[in-house]
Each structure stands twice: as C-alpha cells, then as structure tokens.
C-alpha cells in the first residue's frame, strides 16, 4: 500500500486498491480517491469456457514501450453473417496494416527472450538487448542480415553493458546455428551503426578476467576456498602487463589454483568449462609463471607449494 493525501481526513493516509472495481480508497474514511482505473498488467483469472477456442482473457498482456501498438486496442471484425461488408473489411485491412510494423519486433523479442532464458540471463539484460534491436529496426539497419546473428550479438553487447559478460562461444551455443564469425561481424556492425547516432554510442565497457571467474569456477564445481583464492589471484594478475585476453587469464588462474589444491583439474576439464583451448592455457601459463609468488594468495599456498608446480 502507498500513501496519499485524503481531502476528508486532511492528512496523508494509506491507500487501499480495489482491483475488481478499479477504485482507490482511503484506508481510514473510505473516500474514493480515484475510480475506474485500468489495470494494464496481465490477466490472472479466466472466465470463459475452457473447452472454447476463444481467448478467455478479458484484457491483453502487459504493455511494451518498445512496440508502437502496445497500448490497449480494439479489434475490428466483420459483423456476424457478413461475407464481404466493404466498410468492415476495409477497416480490418487498415488495422492489420497498422499492426504489421510490430510483428517483426514481436518475433525478434520472442527469439531474444528464448536465447536469454537458455543462457540463464536476468531480465535487465534481455530488455537491454531488445532496446538495441529496436534501435537497429528504427534505422532500418536490420534488413537483409542474419537475424539470429543480430539477436545473439544484441545479447552479447547487453551482457557487457550490464557487467555480466558472456563469451561469444557461449553465445554461439544458443544462436540457432549462427557461427562465431557471423555473431562477431554482427556485433561490429551494431556498434558501428548505433555509434553513428549523436549521443547514442554503444559503450561496451571493459571486460576483466574476474567477470568470468565465479561462473567458470562453478562449472568446475570448485570449493568456496578455491574460488576465493582464484578471485584474489585474478585481481592481483591485473597489476602485471600480461598480454592475454581476460578469458585466457581467468582460465590459467583457475589452472594454477586447482594445481595447488587436492582437487586438481586437468587442462581438458578447464578448457571444457571455460571454452579456452588447452594450447592457449599452456601459453598463458608461461606468461604468468614468473609472477606466481605475487599472484597466488599467501594464505592459500606457501612458497614450497609454488616450487612444486611444473615449470612451463
């Protein structure tokens, strides 16, 4: 319940909303402060015969500000028994033509929602991806291109903007057949296209190795103790000029931390969990090896433990 000023009570009082009547009442004196309000959220109850093919909902779904026809609408149909009434059929064609502009967006949003669900992404990322695609559509820049690659690229960019990055390889798994190269090209195209709009540039943000750490560790079922050590180690690794991608650094830090524990993970396991090739992990290990004593947390591994690690 929220508060509002009641003209009868002459003070701020709690409000009671009667959804069935559409009235907002003062909780103390019962004065109707607002009447006949429309609830635009989805209908929860149905009243039609369940065996009927008609839609049992009296009100449509929640409004979507990205759609032109998202407000409450009226359906224009032919009169009962009419086979070709000129007026009603003309109005019907006009209505269908008016709603066509949203059909492509609705399909795009459905596909993005499905991809987002398969990746386990939060709603804010899905909504941001929808916004990116809507901006492309407004500029008529999505036509003639691989739509699945565009949807996937919008999700990739949205993840980065929301500081929940995913690798292109992870995105590729749910991209309905779009390849890494196609998604990469689509991503570059979106950044270039939307960046041309004044004040509307696409800021991808900066990816850090730590952004992937918890998810990769979870994929490997690492202990909380090891996860904490890996997160601390990857933060310390940023102090050195290690010219490797954040994903590669995350993978090699996990390899180092697990080799210092009783629950060792093979390069194959880490490669499968992170999507980084075994050869890349080996080469990254060579770059981090000289800094092991400064990267590995002292509470997790002693100097003697570090000396027992294999040399590259």
From Swiss-Prot:
Which residue ranges traverse the bilayer?
Answer: none
Q: Name one GO biological process term.
A: regulation of pollen tube growth
Recorded GO cellular component terms are:
nucleus
Keyword annotations: Metal-binding, Nucleus, Repeat, Transcription, Transcription regulation, Zinc, Zinc-finger
Result of knocking out the encoding gene: Embryonic lethality and aborted seed when homozygous.
Which Pfam families does this UniProt record tie to the protein?
Answer: TFIIB, Zn_Ribbon_TF
Could you tell me what this protein does?
Answer: General factor that plays a major role in the activation of eukaryotic genes transcribed by RNA polymerase II. Interacts with TBP2 and is required for activated transcription and possibly basal transcription. Plays important roles in pollen tube growth, guidance, and reception as well as endosperm development. Is partially functionally different from TFIIB2 and PBRP2.
Q: How does it assemble?
A: Associates with TFIID-IIA (DA complex) to form TFIID-IIA-IIB (DAB-complex) which is then recognized by polymerase II. Interacts with TBP2. Interacts with ATHB-7 and ATHB-12.
The family assignment reads: Belongs to the TFIIB family.
Entry protein name: Transcription initiation factor IIB-1
Q: Which source organism?
A: Arabidopsis thaliana (Mouse-ear cress)
Gene name, per UniProt, is TFIIB1
């Amino acid at each position: 319940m929220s508060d509002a000023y009641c003209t009868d009570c002459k003070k701020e009082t709690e409000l009671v909303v009667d959804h069935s009547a559409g009235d907002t009442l003062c909780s103390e004196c019962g004065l109707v402060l607002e009447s006949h309000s429309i609830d635009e959220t989805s209908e929860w109850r149905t009243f039609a015969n369940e065996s009927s093919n008609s839609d049992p909902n009296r009100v449509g779904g929640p409004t979507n500000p990205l759609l032109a026809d998202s407000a409450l609408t009226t359906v224009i149909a032919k009169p009962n028994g009419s086979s070709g009434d000129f007026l009603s059929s003309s109005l019907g064609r006009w209505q269908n033509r008016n709603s066509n502009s949203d059909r492509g967006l609705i399909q795009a949003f459905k596909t993005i929602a499905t991809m987002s669900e398969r990746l386990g992404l939060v709603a804010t990322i899905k909504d941001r991806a929808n916004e990116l695609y809507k901006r492309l559509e407004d500029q008529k820049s999505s036509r003639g291109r691989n739509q699945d690659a565009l949807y996937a690229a919008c999700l990739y960019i949205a993840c980065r903007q929301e500081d929940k990055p995913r690798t292109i390889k992870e995105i590729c798994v749910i991209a309905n057949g779009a390849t890494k190269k196609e998604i990469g090209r689509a991503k570059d195209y979106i950044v270039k296209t939307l960046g041309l709009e004044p004040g509307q540039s696409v800021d991808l943000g900066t990816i850090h190795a730590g952004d992937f750490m918890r998810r990769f560790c979870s994929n490997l079922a690492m202990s909380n103790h090891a996860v904490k050590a890996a997160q601390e180690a990857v933060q310390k690794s940023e102090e050195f000029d290690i010219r490797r991608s954040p994903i590669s650094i995350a993978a090699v830090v996990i390899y180092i931390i697990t080799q210092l524990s009783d629950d060792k993970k093979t390069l194959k396991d880490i490669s499968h969990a992170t999507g980084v090739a075994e050869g890349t992990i080996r080469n990254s290990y060579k770059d981090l090896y000289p800094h092991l004593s400064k990267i590995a947390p002292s509470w997790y591994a002693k100097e003697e433990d570090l000396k027992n690690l294999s040399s590259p």
